[in-house]
Each structure stands twice: as C-alpha cells, then as structure tokens.
Design a protein with these regions (language model features):
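NAD(P)-binding Rossmann-fold cofactor-contacting core
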Residues: 141-159
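Conserved beta-strand positions in the Rossmann-like core of class I SAM-dependent methyltransferases
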Residues: 34, 124, 147
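Glycine-rich adenosine-cofactor-binding loop
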Residues: 8, 102-105, 112, 116, ...
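Short phosphate-binding/catalytic loops that engage adenosine nucleotides
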Residues: 29, 143-144, 224
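Phosphate/diphosphate ligand-binding glycine-rich loop within oxidoreductases
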Residues: 2-115
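Rossmann-like adenosine-cofactor binding region
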Residues: 156-227
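Active-site capping/gating segments
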Residues: 110-111, 224-248
C-alpha cells in the first residue's frame, strides 16, 4: 500500500489526514495518509527509513524552510519562494530522491484573485515564516506591492506598532500568515487598528480552524471582506496529489 503523509509539529490542527484518507476511501485508492509529528526536522530521516513505501509528503509549520536542506532537488519556483510544502519521494535503485515543490503560492493566488479589485494595490503580510513567503510571491505575481509585518525588528519588515490607520487605508489587503487566533486560542488576534478598515479592505486568514477567527470578525465589524484558509488548503491538497502522481 502506498503511503503519503504530513510532517510538522504540532499536528493537532491538521486537515490533510482526514481529507486524503476520505479521498482514498471514496475513490478506491490503495493508499493511506499518515501524520508524522516530529519534534525536530532531523527526525525526517527516521520517518523515511521506517516508511520505505512513502511516495510523498506535505510539510507544515515549522519545517517549510528547514526541510529544504534535506532535499535532492527543488523546483525553481519553490527556491524563489524560499519554502517547500510538498515533497515527492522518487524511488531509485533501493534509494530515494526527494524533490521539493511549493503548492501554497498557486493555491493562495487562485483563492484570493477573484476577491481583488482595481483599488487593491498594496498588501500587508502578517508573519515572516514559510507560508508568508508563498503569499508574498503570489501577491507580487498579481501586481501588488507587499510588506511583511513582524513582532520583531527585521530587515525589510515593519512592526505592528507602526501600523497606523493611514497604513490600513493604503495597504487594504491584509493576510494573516501567523498562528495567532488558531484553535484553541480563539480570542487571540493580531493587534491592528481595525476601526480604520472599511468595505475596500480584504482580510484573508490562512487559519481555517475556527471558521471565523477574531481577526476576521474584527474586520467584518467595520465592513471588510473576509476569508479563511480552507479553500487555499483544499487547492494546495489537489495540487499536491497532482505532483505525487506525475502531473507536475
């Protein structure tokens, strides 16, 4: 039986296992999808050694960047993004070749593009991790100017305390790429001047549990258009399946 899986830590919030195993059952596919909750990225080698029939795996927090040093090849797009969330395991003469891809960027682009209007020209990206890199790549490919927001001073980013109402008016697309507000921390949300938002504001939260985060709820209160990350997650899962089945 073929195996697929997900590496990350922690994985209590994982959607992929249920999605893929339901797909396999419904379509009569002889395969299973397993969560590999590994406390360090070095444990990936043990996962590979103990699962010789592993055909591919997804990568989530906090390993989308760290996994890259373990790969034999990486697509040019994933290298440009600087993060990998899909790995194809190619078996060759009793060994394996690991190839890294990024499906987050295309999935996010397909999800947010229908929401954009001509007046959406600048975006704030909350967070600096692997997911934020894919979001940045996608938004720039759509012609938007972007800037990352961080809790800490980092080159090329701004800190939350510098986001004034006038910044919110100018950067009217805001994407949360942090775990702030994720289950079980329902009451948490990024500290922003939500009162400056209006009907021209888009709030996109990569979180999908809960369905409506406090970030989204606060924006809706002032007329913002909001969306969670479920559609993006579904799209990247479909893209992952295509990659693993030689449709890349």
């Amino acid at each position: 039986m073929k195996k697929y899986g997900l590496i990350g830590y922690p994985l209590g919030h994982s959607f992929s296992k249920g999605f893929f195993n339901e797909k396999f059952e419904n379509e009569g596919i002889e395969a299973e999808y397993i969560n590999f909750e590994i406390p360090t990225i070095d444990a990936l080698l043990e996962v590979l050694a103990s699962n010789p029939d592993l055909e591919g795996f997804n990568v989530t927090i906090p390993y989308k960047q760290k996994v890259m040093s373990f790969l034999d090849s990486i697509t040019s797009e994933a290298r440009s993004i600087g993060a990998v969330n899909v790995v194809k395991v190619e078996h060759r003469n009793n060994t394996y070749h690991l190839k890294g891809y990024n499906s987050d960027a295309l999935a996010f682009k397909q999800s947010i593009e229908p929401m954009l209007e001509r007046f959406h020209k600048k975006a704030l990206i909350l967070g600096t991790g692997g997911a934020s890199k894919a979001v940045n790549y996608a938004l720039r490919s759509l012609g938007l100017e972007t800037i990352n927001v961080s809790r800490y001073e980092r080159p090329g980013t701004i800190q939350y305390q510098r986001i004034t109402p006038s910044v919110i008016k100018e950067y009217n697309v805001i994407v949360n790429c942090t775990p702030c507000g994720m289950y079980p921390h329902f009451d948490d949300c990024p500290q922003l001047p939500y009162e400056a938002m209006d009907s021209k504001t888009i709030l996109y939260d990569l979180i999908y549990n809960p369905d409506e985060t406090m970030f989204m709820r606060n924006g809706k209160q002032y007329g913002a258009t909001v969306k969670n990350g479920l559609e993006m997650l579904l799209l990247q899962a479909y893209i992952s399946w295509d990659i693993w089945n030689n449709n890349d």
